[in-house]
Structures are given as C-alpha cells and as structure tokens.
Amino acid sequence: MHYPVRISNLLFSFIVFVLFFLIQSVNAQISLPEIPSKLTFCGEPVPLDDPDIKERLEKELIINMNKHASTILILKESGRWKSYLQAMLDSATVPQEFFYLAVIESELDPVSRSSAGATGLWHFKESTAKEYGLEISDYVDERRDAEKSTRATSVFLKRAYKKFGSWTLTAAAFNRGTTGIDNALKGQDTKSYYQLYLNEETARYVFRILALKLIMEDPGKYGYNLSPTDYYQPVKYETILINESIQDLPKFAKSLGVSYQTLKEHNPWIQNTDYKLVLTEGKEYKIRIPAKKN
C-alpha cells in the first residue's frame, strides 16, 4: 500500500537531482567573462580603471565568447596563420599584436569580402590597396596575396604610427583612415583613442582587437577548450616565380602536378576569370603549391 508513495518520492528526488545538474551546466555555459585588472595593446596601457572602458571591453568579450562557430574557426585558423603573419610584422618592425587586426578584419580568411568590397586577410578597399602598391585587375587581386598585403599593411601602420605616435590610434586609423582619426583628435582636443567620440564601428574596433587577443591567448579561460591537434597546421609550399601570362591555368596546374582547384585555393590572388592569367609586363609573381611529401 505504501509503494506508490515511495516510488513518487524517488521519482521526485531523481527529477530534482537532474534539474540541479542541468542548472549547474547552464550556469557554467553562461558565465560572465573575466576582465583582467591590467591590459596593454602594443605596450600601451588600456585604462580599465575607467568604468566605461571596462564595460566596452566586457561587451566585446561577451559577444565573441558566444559567437561559438566563428570563434572556434578563428582559433583553428590561427594555427595556420599566426606565426607566419607575426613573423612578417616583426620583420617590418610592427608590433606582433597587430595580428589580431587581421583576426577581426577577415577572421583569417584570405578570400573573405566585406559589404563595402574590402577583401583579403587585412580587408583592404580597392582605392587604399592601389595607394599602397597592390595590383588589382581582371586577373590579379593582390589584396588576397598574404605576403604582399601584409607588407602593404605594415607600411600603412608604420606611417600612421609616425603621424600619431600611438599604436592604439594607429589601429583605429586602419579602420577609419588617418584623416578621419586626425580630424577627430583635433576637433575634440584630445590625444587618446579612449576619449574620442567616434562612429560605432571605429569606437568598437580596438575593443574587438583586445577581446580576441584575450580569448586567443587563453581560450580555455573563455570556454574554448582546444587541444594542439585541433588547430589547422601551416602549409609548406614550393614557390614558382612567373613573369609571363598563362593562357591555360588548368593545364599549367597539371604541369605542376596539382589540380586547378589546388592552384586556386593556395593562390587566391588569381582572379577567377576564363581560366587564364594575364600579367603586368616586367613584373614577377609567386605561384605557391603545397610541397610534395617525402
């Protein structure tokens, strides 16, 4: 006669037990990000003692902590790109932390394109790209050449730093333009990015860089537990120098022992037009194909 009551009590206890662990699990998943007490960008302190600055950083951390698919892919792609891009920046005497600028611009996708038409790892617009010596034609788009676009980016950053004397303002200028930042500084009578009233995109820009820097330097702290084998590995390349146009790219690819798809994938600067490549006379270009395994 007492069994149904006992069974009910056991069932109720079991449900409470399950709900407790479900609640604990949800709480763990939606925990707020840890904000460091001190933070720098390229050696320049971020004024986190200002509640507004701390809040702006926290917002970007919350956004990027919860963009699960894109943040995981960024982390995985960093295994392929981080060392390469940081080495190029370092050789140009640009702080390695500007790697995170490429992260927020393109999510480390060399063929990504913004709604404004910017493309490549660093998302150059066409006019700026040409100003910094990158070729864009029906057949070539050097914004999608990792080496050449990183060199162009380094030139821009060094010029901007020479003008502003601040790497933080230099980062903002990459988004807003040097003239835009210069006008804002003069108009608002300040020398600090953190004191500027700016358009929303530029106002968030450095904070997005800082948020991705924090997450990527310690993914586990922000809920992303990747093992070393989860990261995409750098590709080892053989390089072929060319200075003449190619009339049949699939045939050319086959002569190199690769498919046209492989040629295009590893040379995204080649525009997808009628299977040929018309080059500027007297200029040398690099074709990269994956190195053959021994």
Regions found by a protein language model. Name each.
Residues 228-257:
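Primarily a LysM-type cell-wall glycan-binding module
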Residues 2-3, 7-9, 20-93:
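An acidic, Gly/Ser/Thr/Pro-rich helix-cap/linker signature
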Residues 116-138, 150-152, 157, 181-184:
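Substrate-binding/active-site groove segments that recognize
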Residues 67, 71-82, 91-94, 114-122, ...:
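Solvent-exposed, acidic/flexible segments
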Residues 200-223:
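Catalytic cores of secreted or luminal carbohydrate-active enzymes
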Residues 94-111, 170-176, 213, 263-266:
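Short, functionally critical alpha-helical segments immediately adjacent to catalytic or ligand/cofactor-binding
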Residues 157-184:
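Catalytic and binding regions of secreted/periplasmic enzymes and modules that target cell-wall glycans
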Residues 266-294:
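Extracellular LysM carbohydrate-binding repeats and other cell-envelope/extracellular binding modules
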